[in-house]
Amino acid sequence: MISKRIQEQLKKGSPIREAFEEGQRLAKIYGAENVFDFSIGNPYVEAPKKVKESIQKIIEQNPRQIHSYMNDAGYEDVRKKIAESLNRRFGTSFHMHNIIMSVGAAGAMNAAMYALMDVDDEVMVMRPYYPGYTSFILNWQGKKVEVDPDPQTFQPDFEDFESKITERTKLVIVNSPNNPTGAIYTEDTIQRLAQILEKKEQEYGHEIYLLSDEPYRELVYTGETLPYLTKYYNNTLVAYSFSKSLSVPGERIGYLVIPDEVSESQMLIKAVKMTTGMIGYVNAPSLFQKVVAECLDEKANLEFYQKNRDVLYKKLCDLGFEVVPPSGAFYIFIKAPGGDEKRFLEKAHECNILLVGGSFFGYVGYARISFCVSHEKILRSLAAFEKLAELMRE
C-alpha cells in the first residue's frame, strides 16, 4: 500500500499534466492546429548548435571516462569554469568549491533543503509560486508559509513577509524572473528582503537562508541584468538550471552555489555533497556536465519568446483583459474577469484554449499562459482569445 502522504498528493493531481493530456485529446478531435495548449513551460526553441557539437566532441575524446562516476560535487574543471563565468558576469568571487553540480535546479534545491531542514522547519514562499516548492518542502517534512504579493507589481508584501517570519523559519525561497507571473524582483526588493532577514537572524539568533531559484535568469525582456543575490545577503544559496537558457530541460543539469560567506559554508558544502547521494542522484549527469562547461557563453534563441510575448500581451490588453506585464520567463499571468477562475478556465476550454489556474500556483482568480510555443500557434490563437473575451462578457 502506498503511503498516506503520497495518496494525498495523488488526489490533488497536476493541472498542468491534466491540461497537457486534454490537449492531446482535443487535437484528435479538432486537429492540432485548432487547439491552443498553453499549459506547460516546455522550451520551444532548439538548443544552440554548440550543444550538439560539444556532445559529439566530448564523446569522441574519451568514450569511457565520460560515462563514469566522478567527485560527488561534479567534475572539478566544470565547476572551475562555472565559477569563473559567474565571477566575470556578476562581479562575484566564487571558487570551484563553491559550485556543486546538480540534477537541475530542482535537484539542487532538494539537496540543499535536505541538508538544512529539520522536521517542522518553516519555508517561506512568495505567492504566486512554482507548485513544485510544495512537494520539495513536504519531502523534508517542513511547513510551507505563504507570503502575499503586492497585487499591482507582484513584488513581495514586505509587511506580510516580516510578520510571518518566526523562530522556526529556516529558508526563504525566491524565484525571479517568476513562474507564473513573469515578474522580476527589483534591486530595491532584494535589498529590503535582505534587511529584514538580517534583522530577524539577529532577533532569533540563528541563520535564515535565502534560496534563489533561477532557471529563468537569462529570459529577461527589459534589457536589465538581474541582481545576483549572493551580493546582497550572506546566507544566500543559488539553484540554477540550464534547462531554459540552453533549451535542454530533459537533460536535467544545473548547479548549486554555496558562497564562502554562508555560515559554516564548508560544512554545508560537505552536507550537500552527501545529501545529493542520499537522495539517490549520486552525481549530476556526467556527459552534460562537460557539455554545459563548453556552452557557458551560449544561449538558445531566447529573443523568439519576446516576439511571442509582445504579440500576445498586446492582444490580451486590447481585448480588455487585466494582465501582469511579463518582464521575464515565458509566462503571462492573466486575471480571470470578475475573479471567477473556474468559469474563465471553462470558457477558455470551450475555445480550445488550455490554461493553468492561478490556484495551482497559490493565487486564486488568475490563470497562467505559457507562450513558449511556435509563433504560428500564437497568431492562430488570437481569434480564439477574441472569442473567449466575448464569452466572458456574456
Indicate residue ranges for each PLM-predicted region.
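Conserved core of the PLP fold type I
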Residues: 63-205, 217-232, 378
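PLP-dependent enzyme catalytic core of the Aspartate aminotransferase-like
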Residues: 84, 88, 162-163, 170, ...
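Conserved core segment of the aminotransferase class I/II
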Residues: 231-306, 389
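Conserved glycine-rich beta-strand-loop-beta hairpin in the small C-terminal domain of fold type I
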Residues: 286-293, 305-317, 323-335, 365
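N-terminal small-domain helix-loop-helix segment of the aminotransferase-like
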Residues: 2-104, 111, 157, 295-298, ...
